[in-house]
Swiss-Prot record:
Pfam families according to UniProt: RNA_pol_Rpb2_1, RNA_pol_Rpb2_2, RNA_pol_Rpb2_3, RNA_pol_Rpb2_45, RNA_pol_Rpb2_6, RNA_pol_Rpb2_7
Source lineage: Bacteria, Bacillati, Bacillota, Bacilli, Bacillales
Record's protein name: DNA-directed RNA polymerase subunit beta
GO molecular function terms listed in the Swiss-Prot or TrEMBL record: DNA binding; DNA-directed RNA polymerase activity; ribonucleoside binding
Functional note: DNA-dependent RNA polymerase catalyzes the transcription of DNA into RNA using the four ribonucleoside triphosphates as substrates.
Any GO BP annotation: DNA-templated transcription
PROSITE patterns: RNA_POL_BETA
Length: 1182
C-alpha cells in the first residue's frame, strides 16, 4: 500500500499520499478579520480618542477631554437582528471631562456615542439584517519611493515621491538640463533648492555645505532665482495659494500646517517605519567606499579607515556606533520654517562609484532615525530624501518596485473602520468648537456640546455603501471563507479598474506564500482582487508575512523554529523549497539545493541556505488548495476550478470527495458554517435543533463537571444567495468532545468535511454528438435518486403603508378575485404554511384605496347602511412571480401595534418564505474541480447509458476532446485514482504539490485489481454491443453550479414598453422581450422574408397603434392589418427637428405624409385599448 492513513476530525480517515511532514498547523483561516477587529476595539478606538483629545475652544478656556470608553451588551442577539432587519451592534459610551479654566470647574459625564456594529464570531457584520463582510484593501504603503524613468531622448532620469497616509505629497524629479525640481502637493514644479531655503538654509553656501558639492546641485542653484529664505517662502506661497497676497509669516504657517502639523499630515506607524528603513544609513552604506576615517565620538577609537569598502562584515562592526551617534551633525537652520528647532542629521562621506578617479565625494545623509512616535514628516526627512535623490544620480542607492509586497500593505477591517471613525470624530470636533463659542460657558455640559450625528452617519455610510463593505457570498462554506480572505486593490484610496495597468495585476515574485497566484476573478478585475495564501499572516504594520523554517548557519540543520517574514525581509535571504529532501536528522540530502533569492531560482550548496519553506501549499489560497492534482493542471484552468468551487450549490445529500486534498476539513471548520465546540466536555443531549454539552475540566487529576453549554442549530434558513442553510449534528449523546471539534455539519458538509458536490461514475466518450462543445450527458438515475437535488429558499415581502387616500389593508376580502384563489389564505389574508403555490397565486391579500369620487345620495345611503364595503379599493396583493412556485416554508408578520420597529409609513409587514426543491435539469451548469465546466445537454434513461462489464451503467459522459487542448490533466488522474479508491472502499488525500505521483496512482490501480491501462470495455445500452475501443471510466467529483436554468428561462407574452422608444424592455427582471438585432435583420433580408421583417420592426416592436390593432384582429379572428410608422422613426424625426432641421416624410409621388401626433383623434381610444391590453402588469402605483 502506498501512502499512510490520516485522521480528519472524529469521523473521517483518508489515505494520504503526502511525503512532506507538516511542521506547522494551518492558522485560523479567518484570523485576518477577527484579529483586526479585536485590535480596533482594544487599541484602535483608544488611539482615535487620544488623537482628537483634548478639544479646546478658540480662547483656550474650555477644554473637553475623552477619558475612557466602554461597549455595553448588544440590544438584540445575532438571530434576532437578522429577523428584525436591524444592525447587530452594541452601544458605545464614552467618559468625557469638561474643564473650565477660568472657574476651575470640572464636569464629568458618560456620553452615548451611538451603536457600534459588532463582528460575529465568524468574521461578519450584520447590517440591517443582512450579513456583510468588510474586504481587506491592498494599498501603497506610506513611505518615500524612488523610480527611474527615461525621457523622450532616451536620457535616464529619476523621480521620487513622499507618500503620506494623509496629507500633501512631495515629489522630486530631474529634467533634461539636469536640474532637480520639487512639486508640493501636485502643483507646478519649483527648483528643489527653493524648498531647502524655505527650511532655513538661505544661502547657496549653506546648501552646498549641507548636501556636498555636486553639478546637479550647481545647475539647480543657477536656475533658482530666490536668494534668501524670505524670497523662497514667498515663492512657495505663491505656488500653493495663487492670487493671495503673500507674506513671510503666512508662508511659514502654511508650510508648517502642510507638513509639520500632526493633524494635517500623517505618515502612520507604518510610514515612519518605512521612512526610517529607507533613509537609515545602515542600508545605504552597504558596498560603498569610505572617503573619511570613521572615529567613535566617545572613545576616539578608529572604526574604519578612509578607502575601506563596507561589506556586510565591516558594516555589522560599525552598526552599533551608527545607532549611538556616529556621524551626527546638528543642523541649525535660520529664519526658515524649521527655525529655532535644531534637528539631528547623520552624515558619512563616501567616494562616488560613477567617478573612476575617486575624486568625487558624496555625502550620505540619514534622517537620524527619528522616533517612532513622530507621525508627521520632519525637516530631517525632507533633507535625507533629497540627499538620497542626489545620491541616486551618482548610482548610490536603489529604486523601488511599487508592485513589491514590501511596498504594498493591507488595510484590514480594524484600520478601515478607524479611518471612517476618524472622519466622523473630526466632523464632531468642528461642531463641539462651534458650540463652545456660542453657548453660555457656565451652563455648558459635555452632553450638550457633543453631537454624535456625524459619527453615526460616517459609520452608517461605511457599512452601508462603501465599496469594501460587501454582501457576503454565502453560496457555500468555501465561498464564505474565501470572501473573508479576499484582498482588493480597488476601493477608496486604491486603484480603479480603468487606471490599473498590466504590472499591478501581474503575479510578482514577492507574492510567494503571501497571495495566491491562481485565485483571482476572470474579467476586468483580474489581478486586482486576490486571495490570501493559506499560511499567510498580517503583521502590525499591515504587511503580509509568510512562515519559513530557519536553517542553522553553523550546522546546516533545518530546525523546527518558524519565523514569519515580510517580503522585504525575505529579500535578504536564500530560501529553499519545501519539497527538498531531508535526511533523518534534518540536513539537506542533496549536494545542490533548489532555492529562491529575489525572484531568481538558484541551485546552491546547503551551507548557503538561510531558510526553508514550511509546506508546499503555502503558495496557494484555501480554495486552490482544495483542487487535487493541481500540479498537473494548466494555471488558467486551475483559476476557473478555484473560482467555480465557490459557486457550488449545497446539495440535498452532500458527499465528501473520494479524492480530496486534506484541506476540506480545515476549510469547513474555519468557514463559520459548522458548529465547533468551545470547551471540552460530554454530550448530554442531541436534537435536530440544539446540542447540550456539559463542560468538564481536570482538577488535580480528577474530572470535574462544569456549566452546560447550549449550541443552537440553524434549520432551513435562507442564505444571502437564496440557497438553503441547514445544520445537522454529527455527534451522539454520551460522546466526549474536545475544544475545537466539529459538532454539527453546515450546508455542503459531510462528517465535518467540505462536500460541494458528489462522486459520480464518469466515462470520457462521445455519444451521438450530444456532448459536443463541453456539453454533458447524464443518466436519469441522478435525477431519480436526488443526487444533484438542491433546496432553494426565496423571500417575498409585502408592506401595508399609509397612502394619501388612507392606509392600505392586508385582508382576505379582495375585489374581483374568486374563492378558488383564496382557498389557501387564512382569515387575515396571509397564505398558510405548507401550502403549495404556483406562479400568480396570491401570497398576501392587500388592497389600496383608490381616488375618492363624489358620492351620489343613493351611494351615500348605501355607504351608511353597509359601512366600508362601498369604498373604492384596488387589488395590490403580493403574488408568486414567474418561476417562483414551491411550498410555503414560513410566514413572519411584523406589526407596528405589537411594538415591532418598522420603517416610517409602514403599518404592517409580512414576509413569506417559499422553498423549492430543484432537481437537476437539461441546461444546468456543472463542473469538476479542474475548470472543466459544461452544460447538461441530455438526460438519458438509465437503460440507454453505456454500461460496464458488470452491468453498472455510467452516470455521466464527458467529451474527451475537452482535455488535450485545455491541459487540465488533473481530471484524468483524479478519475483513475477515484475509481481505484472506490473499489478499495477508501477515501484518499492528495495535497497540492505533494500528492500522489503517477506511480502512486498506478500502484493504487493495481491494488484495486483494475486493468493495467485503467480503461474499461463499455457496452452500448441501446443495442448491448460493445464499443469499438476501451474507454476511460472512473469516479470524478462533480459539482452543480449556481447557474441554474430555472433562474434563466424566460418567455414574454405582452409586457412593459420603454417610455420614449416604445420598444419592449429587455431582460428577465423587466419581463422583457428578445432583441432581434442587426445581424438577425440581415438574415431575414438575405432570405427575402419581407413581411416577417416588417412585422418584427413594427407591430411586434414599436408601432403603437399597429400593435393594438393587431391584437384586436387576432382576438376577433380577422387578418392582421397593415403596419404603421414605428415610434422610433418618429423619435428620430423629432430629434432632427430639435436640431433645427426641417424633416418631412414624403410619399412616392412627392406628397407630404402627415405623421399623426400623440394627441390626434384616433389615438386616445388606441391608448385606452393599449392600457387594457398591453400593461396588465403595470398598475396605478406609479
Amino acid at each position: 500500500m502506498t501512502g499512510q492513513l490520516v485522521q480528519y476530525g472524529r469521523h473521517r480517515q483518508r489515505r494520504s499520499f503526502a511525503r512532506i511532514s507538516e511542521v506547522l498547523e494551518l492558522p485560523n483561516l479567518i484570523e485576518i478579520q477577527t484579529a483586526s477587529y479585536e485590535w480596533f476595539l482594544r487599541e484602535g478606538l483608544k488611539e482615535m480618542f487620544t488623537d482628537i483629545s483634548p478639544i479646546s475652544d478658540f480662547t483656550g478656556n474650555l477644554v473637553l477631554e475623552f477619558i475612557d470608553y466602554s461597549l455595553s451588551e448588544p440590544k438584540y442577539s445575532i438571530d434576532e437582528s437578522k429577523e428584525r432587519d436591524v444592525t447587530y451592534s452594541a452601544p458605545l459610551r464614552v467618559k468625557v471631562r469638561l474643564q473650565n479654566k477660568e472657574t476651575g470647574e470640572l464636569k464629568e459625564q458618560e456620553v452615548f456615542m451611538g451603536d457600534f456594529p459588532l463582528m460575529t464570531e465568524s468574521g461578519t457584520f450584520i447590517i440591517n439584517g443582512a450579513e456583510r463582510v468588510i474586504v481587506s484593501q491592498l494599498v501603497r504603503s506610506p513611505s518615500v519611493y524612488y523610480n527611474a524613468k527615461l525621457d523622450k531622448n532616451g536620457k535616464r532620469g529619476f523621480g521620487a515621491t513622499v507618500i503620506p497616509n494623509r496629507g500633501a505629497w512631495l515629489e522630486l524629479e530631474t529634467d533634461a538640463k539636469d536640474i532637480v525640481y520639487v512639486r508640493i502637493d501636485r502643483t507646478r514644479k519649483i527648483p528643489v533648492t527653493v524648498l531647502l531655503r524655505a527650511l532655513g538654509f538661505g544661502t547657496d553656501q549653506e546648501i552646498i555645505d549641507l548636501l556636498g558639492d555636486d553639478e546637479y546641485l550647481r545647475n539647480t542653484l543657477e536656475k533658482d532665482n530666490t536668494e534668501s529664505t524670505e524670497k523662497a517662502l514667498i515663492e512657495i506661497y505663491e505656488r500653493l495659494r495663487p492670487g493671495e497676497p503673500p507674506t513671510v509669516e503666512n508662508a511659514k504657517s502654511l508650510l508648517v500646517s502642510r507638513f509639520f502639523d500632526p493633524k494635517r499630515y500623517d505618515l502612520a506607524n507604518v510610514g515612519r517605519y518605512k521612512m526610517n528603513k529607507k533613509l537609515h544609513l545602515k542600508n545605504r552604506l552597504f558596498g560603498q567606499k569610505l572617503a573619511e576615517t570613521l572615529v567613535d565620538p566617545e572613545t576616539g577609537e578608529v572604526l574604519a579607515e578612509a578607502g575601506t569598502i563596507l561589506d556586510r562584515r565591516n558594516l555589522d562592526r560599525i552598526l552599533p556606533h551608527l545607532e549611538n551617534g556616529l556621524g551626527y551633525i546638528d543642523a541649525e537652520p535660520t529664519g526658515g520654517v524649521a527655525e529655532g528647532e535644531p534637528f539631528g542629521l547623520q552624515s558619512i562621506k563616501v567616494i562616488s562609484p560613477d567617478d573612476p578617479d575617486g575624486e568625487r565625494i558624496l555625502n550620505i545623509i540619514g534622517n537620524g532615525n527619528i522616533d517612532r512616535s513622530v507621525k508627521h514628516i520632519t525637516p530631517a526627512d525632507i533633507i535625507a530624501s533629497i540627499n538620497y535623490f542626489f545620491n541616486l544620480l551618482h548610482e548610490v542607492g536603489t529604486t523601488d518596485d511599487i508592485d513589491h509586497l514590501g511596498n504594498r500593505r493591507l488595510r484590514s477591517v480594524g484600520e478601515l473602520l478607524q479611518n471612517q471613525f476618524r472622519i466622523g470624530l473630526s466632523r464632531m470636533e468642528r461642531v463641539v468648537k462651534e458650540r463652545m463659542s456660542i453657548q453660555d460657558q457656565n451652563a455648558i455640559t459635555p452632553q450638550a456640546l457633543i453631537n454624535i450625528r456625524p459619527v453615526i452617519a460616517s459609520l452608517k455610510e461605511f457599512f452601508g455603501s462603501s465599496q469594501l463593505s460587501q454582501f457576503m457570498d454565502q453560496t457555500n462554506p468555501l465561498a464564505e471563507l474565501t470572501h473573508k480572505r479576499r484582498l482588493s486593490a480597488l476601493g477608496p484610496g486604491g486603484l480603479t479598474r480603468e487606471r490599473a495597468g498590466f504590472e499591478v495585476r501581474d503575479v510578482h515574485y514577492s507574492h510567494y506564500g503571501r497571495m495566491c497566484p491562481i485565485e483571482t476573478p476572470e474579467g476586468p478585475n483580474i489581478g486586482l482582487i486576490n486571495s490570501l495564501s493559506s499560511y499567510a499572516k498580517v503583521n502590525e504594520y499591515g504587511f503580509i508575512e509568510a512562515p519559513y523554517r530557519r536553517v542553522d548557519p553553523e550546522t546546516g540543520l533545518v530546525t523546527g523554529d518558524i519565523q514569519y517574514m515580510t517580503a522585504d525581509e525575505e529579500d535578504l535571504y536564500v530560501v529553499a523549497q519545501a519539497n527538498m529532501p531531508l535526511t533523518e536528522d534534518g540536513h539537506f540530502a542533496d549536494e545542490q539545493v533548489l532555492c529562491r533569492f529575489r525572484g531568481q531560482n538558484l541551485s546552491v550548496e546547503p551551507s548557503r541556505v538561510d531558510y526553508m519553506d514550511v509546506s508546499p501549499k503555502q503558495v496557494v489560497s484555501a480554495a486552490t488548495a482544495c483542487i487535487p492534482f493541481l500540479e498537473n493542471d494548466d494555471s488558467n484552468r486551475a483559476l476557473m476550478g478555484a473560482n467555480m468551487q465557490r459557486q457550488a450549490v449545497p446539495l440535498l445529500q452532500p458527499d465528501s470527495p473520494i479524492v480530496g486534498t486534506g484541506m476540506e476539513y480545515v476549510s469547513a471548520k474555519d468557514s463559520g458554517a459548522a458548529i465547533v465546540a468551545k470547551h471540552p466536555g460530554v454530550v448530554e443531549r442531541v436534537t435536530a435543533r440544539e446540542i447540550l454539552i456539559r463542560r468538564t475540566s481536570d482538577v488535580n487529576g480528577s474530572e470535574v463537571s462544569g456549566d452546560l453549554d447550549r449550541y443552537k442549530l440553524q434549520k432551513y434558513v435562507r442564505s444571502n444567495q437564496g440557497t438553503c442553510y441547514n445544520q445537522k449534528p454529527i455527534i451522539a449523546a454520551g460522546d466526549r468532545v474536545e475544544k475545537g471539534e466539529i459538532l454539527a455539519d453546515g450546508p455542503s458538509m459531510d462528517m465535518g468535511e467540505l462536500a460541494l458536490g458528489r462522486n459520480v461514475v464518469v466515462a470520457f466518450m462521445t455519444w451521438d454528438g450530444y456532448n459536443y462543445e463541453d456539453a454533458i450527458i447524464m443518466s436519469e438515475r441522478l435525477v431519480k435518486d436526488d443526487v444533484y437535488t438542491s433546496i432553494h429558499i426565496e423571500e417575498y415581502e409585502s408592506e401595508s403603508r399609509d397612502t394619501k387616500l388612507g392606509p392600505e389593508e392586508i385582508t382576505r376580502d379582495i375585489p374581483n378575485v374568486g374563492d378558488d384563489a383564496l382557498r389557501n389564505l387564512d382569515d387575515r389574508g396571509i397564505i398558510r404554511i405548507g401550502a403549495e403555490v404556483k406562479d400568480g397565486d396570491i401570497l398576501v391579500g392587500k388592497v389600496t384605496p383608490k381616488g375618492v369620487t363624489e358620492l351620489t345620495a343613493e351611494e351615500r345611503l348605501l355607504h351608511a347602511i353597509f359601512g366600508e364595503k362601498a369604498r373604492e379599493v384596488r387589488d395590490t396583493s403580493l403574488r408568486v412571480p414567474n418561476g417562483g412556485d414551491g411550498i410555503i416554508l414560513d410566514v413572519k408578520v411584523f406589526d407596528r401595534e405589537n411594538g415591532d420597529e418598522l420603517s416610517p409609513g409602514v403599518n404592517q409587514m409580512v414576509r413569506v418564505y417559499i422553498v423549492q426543491k430543484r432537481k437537476i435539469h437539461e441546461g444546468d451548469k456543472m463542473a469538476g474541480r479542474h475548470g472543466n465546466k459544461g452544460v447538461i445537454s441530455r438526460i438519458l434513461p438509465e437503460e440507454d447509458m453505456p454500461y460496464m462489464p458488470d452491468g453498472t451503467p455510467v452516470d455521466i459522459m464527458l467529451n474527451p476532446l475537452g482535455v488535450p487542448s485545455r491541459m487540465n490533466i488533473g481530471q484524468v488522474l483524479e478519475l483513475h485514482l477515484g475509481m481505484a479508491a472506490k473499489k478499495l472502499g477508501i477515501k484518499v488525500a492528495t495535497p497540492v504539490f505533494d500528492g500522489a505521483r503517477e506511480e502512486d496512482v498506478w500502484a493504487t490501480i493495481e491494488e484495486a485489481g483494475m486493468d493495467k491501462d485503467a480503461k474499461t470495455r463499455l457496452y452500448d445500452g441501446r443495442t448491448g454491443e460493445p464499443f469499438d475501443n476501451r474507454v476511460s471510466v472512473g469516479v470524478m467529483y462533480m459539482i452543480k453550479l449556481a447557474h441554474m436554468v430555472d433562474d434563466k428561462l424566460h418567455a414574454r407574452s405582452t409586457g412593459p414598453y420603454s417610455l420614449v422608444t416604445q420598444q419592449p424592455l429587455g431582460g428577465k427582471a423587466q419581463f422583457g422581450g428578445q432583441r432581434f438585432g442587426e445581424m438577425e435583420v440581415w438574415a431575414l433580408e438575405a432570405y427575402g422574408a419581407a413581411y416577417t421583417l416588417q412585422e418584427i420592426l413594427t407591430i411586434k416592436s414599436d408601432d403603437t397603434v399597429g400593435r393594438v390593432k393587431a391584437y384586436e384582429a387576432i382576438v376577433k379572428g380577422e387578418s392582421v392589418p397593415k403596419a404603421g410608422v414605428p415610434e422610433s422613426f418618429r423619435v428620430l424625426i423629432k430629434e432632427l427637428q430639435a436640431l433645427g432641421m426641417e424633416v418631412k416624410m414624403m410619399s412616392a409621388d412627392d406628397e407630404e405624409v402627415e405623421m399623426k401626433d400623440e394627441d390626434d383623434d384616433n389615438i386616445p381610444n388606441a391608448t385606452s385599448a393599449l392600457e387594457q391590453v398591453v400593461q396588465p402588469t403595470v398598475t396605478e402605483e406609479e
